[in-house]
Amino acid sequence: MRCKRIAALGLACLMLAGCGSHAEETTLPPETAPSIVETLPAETTVPETTVPPATEPEPALEAGVTVVADGDVLESGSVLFEGITYVKADEFFPALDEGEYAFYETKGHTLLWKGVEYSILPDHEGLIRDGKTMILSAPVLTRRDGIWIPVEELCGMLDISLLSDPSKETLYCTAIASDWSWETGVRIPILMYHGVTDNVWGAEELFVSPSDMEEQIKYLVENGYDTITFEDWSHLEDFDKPVMLTFDDGYLDNYEELFPILQKYNAKATIFAITVSVDKDERTMTSEQAWEMHHSGLVSIQSHTYNHPHLSKCTEEELHNQMLWSKLHVARITGYEPFVICYPYGDSDAEARDIGAEYYSFGLNMTGGLYTTSTNVFQIPRYYVARNTSLSAFIDMVDEAGR
């Protein structure tokens, strides 16, 4: 190998010597090493490492019951602290139908309720009412996940009804008419119907033809009448000619025939459901249908007792069961606590009405004619609209509406 390298070197020298007079001399630049620029790090100030103060663990809170506020299930439910049920302010306030909720940096969570402003600030144990602090018997809890308020005491201040359903571990918070005041001396024709169909069964007179039903509602709308529900009684002054359409039993045709007519004319009605029949009788509405109608804002689902007995023949215990069971069932279906009872067959006695008043705010008879608002709200009369009721007879029933 070494001999081959020497021979090759010799041959190269001879070639260069022979061509030296004809070739330009090539000068290769000297090999240079790459320059290395030394960069010194800039002088920096390293911040001192600070250890954040240890965060004290928050007191453990036990999960509470499901809470439904005016039909809305609160996502966080409730918690228990020292035996008191709490809900999150930023979930509870917005769920209330009649309130206006907002959050302000200066005021915190704010609810405008019946003309009064309530607000809750972080780390502030009281409830601020129109700028004045009200100290609650249970403190407001400021936690990393939000501000929690004692729901029972708050509902008491806002006149919101609480209905406990232990078997379903649910608490219903509903703004109902138990503490409302309303204008007296207002004439309200309250019309009693049952079914709306041409496929009659049983007592034919109970079923109004859909075409007649539409004709009657169209007359009301075109002649300046206001169809209202009991939820509207808190502001009766807004209605010049109030009329109430009520339907007993909760038949399927109330959804299939009546509801589309109400939607067409933007009219309101109240349906009194026999709660044991919901979802179990092919002729009565389902829970889903009742929920849809109630949440449309056009229909109010209320109670017609649990299984439609003659209340005057019930024992005291049976009366309590009829009132409570139907109340719980309607709340489970709609998310709202019902506050009106319609007496089956129009049959009630003093005991039935007194016990009914423990659970409801209004009680309706079957017949009796025109109602004028007063303090007597547990024997409210109605006009009976039958299948053979003519339009002229219907007009006579509603003609006196107003003041």
Label each PLM-derived region with a short phrase.
Residues M1-A7:
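Bacterial N-terminal signal peptides that target proteins for export
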Residues V221, F259-A267, M285-S303, G356-A357, ...:
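Acidic (Asp/Glu)-rich catalytic clusters
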Residues R283-Q289, E318-Q322:
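Charged helix-capping and loop-helix junction motifs
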